[in-house]
Amino acid sequence: MADKYEPRLKTEYVSRIRGAMQEKFSYANVMMIPKLDKIVINMGVGEATADSKKPTIAAGDLAAIAGQKPVITKARNSIAGFKVREHMPIGAKVTLRGERMYEFLDRLINIALPRVRDFRGLNPKSFDGRGNFAMGIKEHIVFPEINYDKVDQMWGMDIIVCTTATSDDEARALLTEFNFPFRH
């Protein structure tokens, strides 16, 4: 029987990145070494007020990108200025953990981000103070799973990379080891 498949970045984390982090921060315990916890992808669909089918279409694209069925997000309260009613579908989100998380991260770093127009690197200040990194992508068509010819509308998305790191410096070092393209 063939060996169980393991994502490339997970193998790299176990074999190389953990050792590099241990060496850099000299942790007393192996369990103190930061690791990736989850990746949350959120798509807010502003046009949902005009057409209630838009969040469903966005969720289909998000499912193709993430490889997992997203949850349709609904408005918590009504905002008359934006023509939003309570419980109206306004977007989609998905939380990736485990192997799907590593697979998505690999595609994001090596395929999607280099395809972004005028990409000069990720902002190294986009950490939240607790070891989590957030970024936004303006066009979802940079992912190879999306067929450019079949897309009638482009949506942006927020991508939050959650780590077990306790500080921004640890998280920045971890993501740099994963070859995140931070600008200098």
UniProtKB/Swiss-Prot annotation:
A GO term from the CC aspect: ribonucleoprotein complex
Main function: This is one of the proteins that bind and probably mediate the attachment of the 5S RNA into the large ribosomal subunit, where it forms part of the central protuberance. In the 70S ribosome it contacts protein S13 of the 30S subunit (bridge B1b), connecting the 2 subunits; this bridge is implicated in subunit movement. Contacts the P site tRNA; the 5S rRNA and some of its associated proteins might help stabilize positioning of ribosome-bound tRNAs.
Chain segments annotated as coiled-coil in the UniProt record: none
GO MF, one annotated term: structural constituent of ribosome
UniProt keyword terms in alphabetical order: Ribonucleoprotein, Ribosomal protein, RNA-binding, rRNA-binding, tRNA-binding
UniProt xrefs under InterPro entries: Ribosomal_uL5, Ribosomal_uL5_bac-type, Ribosomal_uL5_C, Ribosomal_uL5_CS, Ribosomal_uL5_dom_sf, Ribosomal_uL5_N
PANTHER family, per the entry: 60S RIBOSOMAL PROTEIN L11-RELATED (PTHR11994)
Similarity comment: Belongs to the universal ribosomal protein uL5 family.
SUBUNIT field: Part of the 50S ribosomal subunit; part of the 5S rRNA/L5/L18/L25 subcomplex. Contacts the 5S rRNA and the P site tRNA. Forms a bridge to the 30S subunit in the 70S ribosome.
Species of provenance: Agrobacterium fabrum (strain C58 / ATCC 33970) (Agrobacterium tumefaciens (strain C58))
PROSITE patterns for this protein: RIBOSOMAL_L5 (PS00358)
Protein name: Large ribosomal subunit protein uL5
Entry's Gene Ontology BP terms: translation
Pfam families: Ribosomal_L5, Ribosomal_L5_C
Alphabetized SUPFAM superfamilies for the sequence: RL5-like
